[in-house]
């Protein structure tokens, strides 16, 4: 499996894949998660992720920056990022508008947001960092 502790070439490749909307796998110590940058996410890829999620017991969530979370009035428990639970049913428009400030007027009432407190947030922090390095909105869907 690919780990974020690998060499610089692997990291550069993962950042490039995120830029093109290709999911990547990050992890360490036997815990791995699929990371999808929200900005290039399209409806087709989202539907495939939903199918995968429905066939497993995984709980996907969104990682966003502290600044975005504060604007959305979501609680921040992990330093400089917030991990948000997805609503049921999961909506493509909700995910995109939560991540993208340019859609705040199109989809004004998205809350309430429920932040994750438990679990390790290290992979989420790396995912946000990779999105920033890819020059994307710092928001990721994590499965």
What are these regions (language model features)?
Residues 1-143:
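Catalytic domains of riboflavin
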């Amino acid at each position: 499996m690919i780990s974020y502790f690998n060499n610089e070439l692997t990291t550069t490749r993962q950042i490039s894949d995120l830029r093109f909307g290709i999911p990547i796998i990050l992890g360490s110590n036997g815990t791995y998660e699929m990371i999808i940058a929200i900005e290039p996410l399209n409806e087709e890829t989202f539907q495939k992720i939903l199918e995968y999620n429905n066939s497993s017991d995984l709980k996907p969530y969104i990682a966003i920056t502290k600044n975005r979370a504060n604007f959305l009035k979501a609680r921040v428990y992990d330093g400089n990022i917030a991990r948000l639970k997805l609503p049921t049913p999961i909506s493509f428009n909700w995910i995109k508008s939560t991540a993208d400030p340019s859609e705040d007027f199109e989809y004004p009432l998205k809350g309430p947001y429920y932040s994750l407190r438990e679990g390790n947030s290290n992979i989420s922090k790396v995912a946000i960092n990779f999105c920033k390095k890819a020059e994307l909105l710092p928001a990721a869907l994590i499965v």
